[in-house]
Structure formats: structure tokens, C-alpha cells
Amino acid sequence: MSGGLAPSKSTVYVSNLPFSLTNNDLYRIFSKYGKVVKVTIMKDKDTRKSKGVAFILFLDKDSALNCTRAINNKQLFGRVIKASIAIDNGRAAEFIRRRNYFDKSKCYECGESGHLSYACPKNMLGEREPPKKKEKKKKRKLPEPEEEIEEVEVSEEEGEDPALDSLSQAIAFQQAKIEEEQSKWRPNPGGPSTSDDSRRPRIKKSAYFSDEEELSD
């Protein structure tokens, strides 16, 4: 079975129904043949009374075919029922559209207040259990942080610490860089000196803060 409803193949046209049967009655009668999605009874525009004709939309075409074979030319409440696969008149999309009944104070079957159609006294087969409401999934909100996000610390490899805002701090920082640079060129204690070590220039510590470095011969 392909995904989605196919009303042109899964809708049963039923005629010669008893006029007293309600939507809920037909739902209970035809549910034995498969999953019923929608029941539509044709009614008179003025009197709102049933014309004895209904469309039963099943979830799949196999259920609709089983229904027509089982109920066609069979008696129901003393009447011979006619059932067949409905002919698509081009309004299939409109037919399967779900209707929302916003006024929950009155029964849409009889128009009286105090009950809904599921428990309408005119249901010949008694009350029907209403469908369960689908629970809406609530979006989980991210918890608000109790403290402000800490600033990311800048490592020495990424650049100078921006906190060096005074001259004394800048001098100390520059001096540490010079000493670190000298330690890289300093030979291991007790090890023989190489010709490369003697050729490398020695950096002379500057007495003041400067971008230039003094080299000694």
C-alpha cells in the first residue's frame, strides 16, 4: 500500500440506508471491515434529514473492497443495501479534508446542547467512544544560564595578553620573551658546542622597552 489516502479507490458508496442511522452508527457498522477514516451522510439542505446515502472512506482500498463484497445486496435493518466503490468526481481532496467543529456546546447530529454526537440519543447503536486526542509535543526550552558565559582565555600562542595595558607590564612581558628566545639557542650543559651555536648571534638584553633588539658580535 502506498503512503497517503486514495479516496478514489478506498471510498464506498452506500445507498438505501435507513434514514434513522447516524454517522456514529455507520462508523460502528463499517468498522468491522477495516479502519474507517470518515463517514459522510448525504442530508437534505432544508430539513437536515438523511437521504439514505452515505460515503464511507477507508484507510486502504483492500478494506473498501472487502466491505462492498460483504454488504452489497445484504439486508440491514430490513432494507437491502447497495454498496460499491465510489466514482471520483474530482472532489476527492475536498472530501478527505478534515472538518473542525469549533462549537462544542451542541451536538451536530441533532443540534441539541448538553452532549456531543458520540453520545447522541439518536444513535440507534448507542454511544460510541470518542477518539483519543493527540497530545501535542511541547518544545523543550533550553535552561537559562545562571551565570554569564566566561570569556575565552587567549593562549600565548594566539597573541599577547590584552591585559597588558601598562608600560611596566609590557616591559616585563617583552623581557620574558627575550629570555625564552635565548633559552632555545643555549647549548646543553656538558655537551660539545657546535659550529652552528657559535655562529648564532647573541641577543643583548635591552634596558628599555623597544621593538628593536640589540645584537652583539
Swiss-Prot record:
Keywords: Metal-binding, mRNA processing, mRNA splicing, Nucleus, Phosphoprotein, RNA-binding, Spliceosome, Zinc, Zinc-finger. Disulfide bonds: none annotated. InterPro entries: Nucleotide-bd_a/b_plait_sf, RBD_domain_sf, RRM_dom, RRM_dom_euk, ZCRB1, ZCRB1_RRM, Znf_CCHC, Znf_CCHC_sf. Expressed at higher level in heart and testis, and at lower level in cerebellum. Weakly expressed at low level in liver. Residues 10-88 form the RRM domain. Transmembrane segments: none annotated. The keyword Nucleus applies. The modification Phosphoserine is found at residues 155, 210, 216. CDD domains: RRM_ZCRB1. One of its GO terms (biological process) is mRNA splicing, via spliceosome. It is found in: Nucleus, Nucleoplasm. It comes from the Eukaryota. The keyword Membrane does not apply. A zinc finger (CCHC-type) spans 105-122. GO terms for cellular component: nucleoplasm; U12-type spliceosomal complex. Residues 120-217 are annotated as: Disordered. Residues 145-163 have a biased composition (Acidic residues). GO terms for molecular function: RNA binding; zinc ion binding. Component of the U11/U12 snRNPs that are part of the U12-type spliceosome. Interacts with ZRSR1. This is Zinc finger CCHC-type and RNA-binding motif-containing protein 1. It comes from Mus musculus.
